[in-house]
């Protein structure tokens, strides 16, 4: 099994989404010892944002890098994304990666009945971290966007592991992380029992 692990937080070692995504990958390694993990840190190794130049693919090195990103995505059976909420949405580095994998004719296509995803059969696990609590849907453009986008690509097996309110206080941060990790442990126990 191939697993693609992406982190997008700019906070480095203090990032909750990175801690959660690492815990998710560790869980997958315990459940599936044969798993092959490919890791990409989108903050330390960002993908260039789309521009007229990158879309034209006149630079062979840029075209090869874009194809490598696409192949990592296509070959992965499980994708783990560390996705913090930045300004009600996702980091621009994660959006730049999405722009490289959401490609007509590769991961979706248009039909007479509407668009159809071509990237089905994958499992997506999102490690979501938020400084506040966003129970009001009108303030959350992060999780609905990710669900919609990956659903559009044909991925319907999507799990969210969420830590909210981490900026309220050190205690809130610890409690939110503990709750998210406890949920992850419960999911692992259920998988082992199945």
From Swiss-Prot:
Q: What class of enzyme is it?
A: oxidoreductase
Q: Which cofactors, by name?
A: FMN
| Reaction(s) catalysed by this chain's protein | 2 a quinone + NADH + H(+) = 2 a 1,4-benzosemiquinone + NAD(+); N,N-dimethyl-1,4-phenylenediamine + anthranilate + 2 NAD(+) = 2-(4-dimethylaminophenyl)diazenylbenzoate + 2 NADH + 2 H(+)
The record's section on InterPro entries has: Flavodoxin_fold, Flavoprotein-like_sf, FMN-dep_NADH:Q_OxRdtase_AzoR1, NADH:quinone_OxRdtase_FMN_depd
- Keywords on record: Flavoprotein, FMN, NAD, Oxidoreductase
Known EC number:
1.6.5.-, 1.7.1.17
What does the record say about how the cofactor binds?
Answer: Binds 1 FMN per subunit.
What's this protein's family per the entry? Belongs to the azoreductase type 1 family.
Oligomer status and interactors: Homodimer.
Q: What does this protein do?
A: Quinone reductase that provides resistance to thiol-specific stress caused by electrophilic quinones.
* Stated name of the protein: FMN-dependent NADH:quinone oxidoreductase
User: What's the source species for this entry?
Assistant: Xanthomonas oryzae pv. oryzae (strain MAFF 311018)
Kindly list the organism's lineage.
Answer: Bacteria, Pseudomonadati, Pseudomonadota, Gammaproteobacteria, Lysobacterales
């Amino acid at each position: 099994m191939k697993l693609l692990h992406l982190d997008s937080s700019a906070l480095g070692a203090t990032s909750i989404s990175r801690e959660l995504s690492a815990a998710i990958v560790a869980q997958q390694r315990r459940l599936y010892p044969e798993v092959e993990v490919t890791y990409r840190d989108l903050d330390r190794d960002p993908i260039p944002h789309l521009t007229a130049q990158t879309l034209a693919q006149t630079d062979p090195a840029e075209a090869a890098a874009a194809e490598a990103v696409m192949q990592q995505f296509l070959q992965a059976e499980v994708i783990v994304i560390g996705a913090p909420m930045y300004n009600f949405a996702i980091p621009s580095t994660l959006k730049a990666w999405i722009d490289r994998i959401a490609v007509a004719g590769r991961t979706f296509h248009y039909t007479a009945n509407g668009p159809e995803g071509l990237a089905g059969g994958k499992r997506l696990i999102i490690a979501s971290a938020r400084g506040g609590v966003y129970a009001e849907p009108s303030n959350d453009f992060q999780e609905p966007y990710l669900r919609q986008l990956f659903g559009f690509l044909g991925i319907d097996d999507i799990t969210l592991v969420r830590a909210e309110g981490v900026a309220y206080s050190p205690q809130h941060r610890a409690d939110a992380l503990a709750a998210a990790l406890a949920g992850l442990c419960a999911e692992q126990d259920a998988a082992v029992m199945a």
